[in-house]
């Protein structure tokens, strides 16, 4: 799979983010050009289009629903200590609730906050002291780990459904005879 080529006019967010191209494929990133308080609106998502299938650049908006951002927001990488939250229920990108954003900060979000499963899982190298290692989507993560993060409503709903379908711990035989 080759690195994608943007089809939108760049820069798409010249006042708020700068794309930094890496020396090798898949190493581009985005840096903040603004300082904002925790929880502040960073950007609305206004250029997205439905994605006919899940890709490594798509963002999940609901069960079986994905979009392509069609903007430089696609360069916001994953981090286990994210600087942003992608709220797909409001199509807004906000500064993480637990810390402010400074000029020069890398723009990142916690991919499992939007993704139930991923077409291209990867080993995380975010460098956070809380780095989780393999990132493959929220369906493969422990609820106790996910509880430390802000999650989109569709991910919370899918997690609730998953917890309801987990088999009981009991090894006793259950009789269904009337």
From Swiss-Prot:
Residue ranges constituting the Post-SET domain according to the UniProt record: 120-136
Pathway assignment: Secondary metabolite biosynthesis; terpenoid biosynthesis
Binding positions for Zn(2+) per the UniProt entry: 124, 126, 131
Enzyme Commission number(s) of this protein: 2.1.1.-
GO molecular-function terms, A-Z: metal ion binding; methyltransferase activity
Keywords: Metal-binding, Methyltransferase, Transferase, Zinc
Keyword Repeat appears in the UniProt entry: no
Metal-binding in keyword set: yes
Biological process terms in GO annotation: methylation; terpenoid biosynthetic process
Highest taxon of source: Eukaryota
EC primary class: transferase
Catalytically driven reaction(s): L-lysine + 2 S-adenosyl-L-methionine = N(6),N(6)-dimethyl-L-lysine + 2 S-adenosyl-L-homocysteine + 2 H(+)
Known function: Methyltransferase; part of the gene cluster that mediates the biosynthesis of flavunoidine, an alkaloidal terpenoid with a tetracyclic cage-like core connected to dimethylcadaverine via a C-N bond and acylated with 5,5-dimethyl-L-pipecolate. The tetracyclic core is synthesized by the terpene cyclase flvE and the cytochrome P450 monooxygenase flvD.
Family statement drawn from the similarity comment of this UniProt entry: Belongs to the class V-like SAM-binding methyltransferase superfamily.
Protein name: Methyltransferase flvH
Organism expressing this protein natively: Aspergillus flavus (strain ATCC 200026 / FGSC A1120 / IAM 13836 / NRRL 3357 / JCM 12722 / SRRC 167)
Organism lineage: Eukaryota, Fungi, Dikarya, Ascomycota, Pezizomycotina
Gene: flvH
């Amino acid at each position: 799979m080759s690195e994608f080529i943007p089809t939108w006019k760049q820069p798409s967010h010249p006042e708020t983010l700068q794309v930094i191209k890496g020396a090798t494929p898949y190493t581009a990133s985005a840096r903040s050009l603004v300082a904002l308080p925790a929880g502040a609106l960073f950007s609305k998502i206004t250029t997205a289009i439905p994605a006919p299938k899940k890709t490594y650049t798509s963002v999940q908006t609901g069960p079986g629903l994905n979009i392509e951002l069609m903007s430089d927001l696609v360069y916001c990488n994953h981090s286990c200590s994210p600087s942003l939250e992608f709220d797909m229920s409001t199509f807004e990108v906000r500064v993480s609730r637990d810390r402010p954003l400074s000029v020069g900060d890398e723009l990142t979000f916690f991919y499992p906050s939007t993704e139930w499963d991923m077409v291209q899982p990867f080993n995380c190298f975010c460098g956070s002291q809380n780095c989780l290692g393999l990132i493959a989507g929220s369906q493969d993560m422990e609820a106790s780990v996910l509880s430390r993060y802000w999650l989109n409503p569709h991910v919370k709903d899918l997690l609730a459904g998953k917890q309801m379908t987990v088999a009981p711990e009991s090894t006793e035989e259950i009789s269904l005879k009337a």
